[in-house]
Amino acid sequence: MPRLIFLGPPGAGKGTQAERLAAIYHTPKISTGDLLRAEVKAQTPLGCQAKVYMDAGELVPDEVLIGMVKGQLQHSPAQGWILDGFPRTLAQAEALEELLRELGQDYDHVLNLEVPDDVVVARLLARGKEQGRSDDADEAVILKRLQVYREQTAPLIDFYEARGRLRRIDGNQPMESVQEHLRALLEGFRRTA
């Protein structure tokens, strides 16, 4: 079963593609956003820790996120997993590598969905209107998110490329085309493994 990490700017389609692959391969999709919401709602110790930061409008510390991800990775080693929204920083990527070594696991591929900024802005503005998401309805907020992505997450491309695990995917095409490309890529790797 695949063990995948999705990267790409906001609005690239990471969540959509990760969800589709998770359904096809019967593999858990691990989304840090979903994890945070679930842990906070369940009032777990990690959720209570995270809530303090979230309520203050601050980023949840890496050690809290790593704790949540660790719990999920321990539950599904044989099924594989798909990480969506994690890691977002070099420090998180390094912590994930250490965690995977500790768990005796590894990842197969890092799938980087590449989409030009103007397309990202257009997609997010459309999503903001359709879904009423305030973080996607304001172009200034979107541009700030892209800036944060370039500063914090884009360095992961070099990190994973240096490890020979990065796969660049043209995310500037219809969802179905991206999905077909991803499936062909993964099937090709399964045949050669």
Curated annotation (Swiss-Prot):
Annotated stretches, region: LID: 126-136
Chain positions covered by the region annotation NMP: 31-60
Keywords: ATP-binding, Cytoplasm, Kinase, Nucleotide biosynthesis, Nucleotide-binding, Transferase
Catalytic activity, reaction form: AMP + ATP = 2 ADP
Enzyme Commission (EC) number: 2.7.4.3
Pathway the protein contributes to: Purine metabolism; AMP biosynthesis via salvage pathway; AMP from ADP: step 1/1
Family: Belongs to the adenylate kinase family.
Binding site for ATP: G11, A12, G13, K14, G15, T16, R127, Q173
Location in or out of the cell: Cytoplasm
Swiss-Prot/TrEMBL domain comment: Consists of three domains, a large central CORE domain and two small peripheral domains, NMPbind and LID, which undergo movements during catalysis. The LID domain closes over the site of phosphoryl transfer upon ATP binding. Assembling and dissambling the active center during each catalytic cycle provides an effective means to prevent ATP hydrolysis.
Example of a GO MF term: ATP binding
Cellular component per GO, a single term: cytoplasm
PROSITE patterns: ADENYLATE_KINASE
A Pfam family assignment: ADK
Protein task: Catalyzes the reversible transfer of the terminal phosphate group between ATP and AMP. Plays an important role in cellular energy homeostasis and in adenine nucleotide metabolism.
Top enzyme class: transferase
Membrane-spanning segments: none
Family matches, as InterPro entries: Adenyl_kin_sub, Adenylat/UMP-CMP_kin, Adenylat_kinase_CS, P-loop_NTPase
Domain of life: Bacteria
Gene3D superfamilies, per the entry: P-loop containing nucleotide triphosphate hydrolases
Residues annotated as binding AMP: T32, R37, E58, L59, V60, G85, F86, P87, R88, Q92, R133, R145
Subunit organization: Monomer.
Name listed for the protein in its UniProt record: Adenylate kinase
